[in-house]
């Protein structure tokens, strides 16, 4: 159990790792670059951007680890923070992230509804899941170079793969969309997202349709077919790091016999579902090679 002195030392170390020299604030020129990169036509609101205050767009990049309300720091550090290149922020991007998530879901659902008029609900649901998953949104975020403007603490950047963290990239894209929706409206957001989705160099929708990368579902079907309807079981083996930026180790137990569950694979990830998917993929690969051995 952590002692009081150990906790104090940990908190002091935490304080020393808040300031991040890599942080930069978004400018209007940066915003124009992002919109240019998207490939959309934004000429109708270009004049508005030139005259507007972009502080709300800057909020879209504020990670809570660099926000005053979310961290406990000494009065000395508070005073020191006033001289930082980018001071601690007042508001995080979480509210905009919440909004952007819903806007993206609606835009993609509407897009699929119109594009595939003869397809059933199940087809559209599966394809929407692939288009709004962490992997896809992180890819869009990286393509637009949003990661460059994330304002986060140094300890978070050091701990979670820096600006390549898939979850951070996904959240940043969602919050950027949330701000865009509030400032420019639904139609503008729709054009912005669809310009990215229909960029074949970014996303190949036909490939998403043809290739099933839901390994958990594949493993479930295989288990039902060959193991008398029994379900695989996913369990957490360990968790490393702080709760907000933890790395999870998940395993999958496959019911190779009626009374025998075998830990067939394990994988790590910053998101439990991703680690489960990867462990399912490894298990499927083993099964296809007739390897039903348990891992240590």
Language model segments and positions:
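Double-stranded RNA-binding/processing signature
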Residues: 1-296
């Amino acid at each position: 159990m952590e002692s009081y002195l150990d906790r104090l030392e940990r908190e002091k170390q935490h304080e020393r790792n808040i300031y991040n020299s890599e942080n930069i604030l978004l400018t209007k020129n940066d915003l124009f670059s992002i919109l240019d990169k998207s490939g959309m036509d934004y000429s109708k609101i270009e004049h508005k951007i030139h005259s507007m205050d972009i502080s709300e767009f800057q909020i879209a990049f504020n990670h809570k680890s660099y926000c005053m309300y979310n961290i406990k720091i000494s009065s000395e550090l508070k005073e020191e923070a006033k001289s930082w290149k980018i001071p601690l922020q007042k508001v995080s991007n979480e509210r905009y992230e919440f909004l952007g998530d819903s806007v993206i879901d609606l835009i993609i659902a509407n897009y699929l509804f119109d594009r595939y008029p003869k397809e059933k609900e199940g087809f559209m649901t599966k394809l929407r899941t692939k288009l709004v998953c962490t992997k896809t949104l992180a890819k869009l975020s990286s393509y637009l170079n949003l990661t460059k403007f994330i304002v986060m603490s140094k300890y978070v950047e050091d701990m979670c793969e820096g600006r390549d963290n898939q979850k951070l990239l996904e959240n940043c894209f969602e919050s950027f969309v949330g701000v865009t929706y509030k400032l420019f409206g639904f139609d503008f957001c729709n054009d912005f997202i669809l310009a990215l989705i229909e960029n074949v160099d970014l996303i190949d929708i036909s490939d998403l349709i043809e290739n099933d990368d839901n390994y958990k579902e594949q493993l479930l079907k295989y288990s039902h077919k060959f193991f008398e309807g029994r379900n695989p079981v996913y369990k957490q083996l360990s968790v490393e790091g702080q709760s907000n930026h933890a790395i999870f180790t998940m395993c999958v137990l496959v019911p190779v016999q009626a009374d025998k569950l075998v830990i067939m694979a394990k994988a790590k990830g910053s998101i439990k579902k991703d680690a489960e998917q990867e462990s399912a993929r490894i298990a499927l690969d083993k099964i296809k090679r007739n390897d039903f051995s348990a891992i240590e």
